[in-house]
């Protein structure tokens, strides 16, 4: 059976929105990382390199910064 093609999602716009919201609230990556149990480098990769976070981390970041996923659809 042939595999169904999987659509790759470009996460860059989400990462940029997270970075804008985080810096707008004057929060450092270290602060956010400590509070969310993430490394600052991982957060930087999400913000700058479009790394796909786990669904749980994605959900927590969207809630933390009140970002609507609908704006990217």
Can you name each region flagged by the protein language model?
Residues 37-52:
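Recognition helix of helix-turn-helix/homeodomain-like DNA-binding domains
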Residues 2-24:
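A short, Lys/Arg-rich alpha-helix, primarily the initiator
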Residues 30, 41, 70:
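Key DNA-contact positions within bacterial/archaeal DNA-binding proteins
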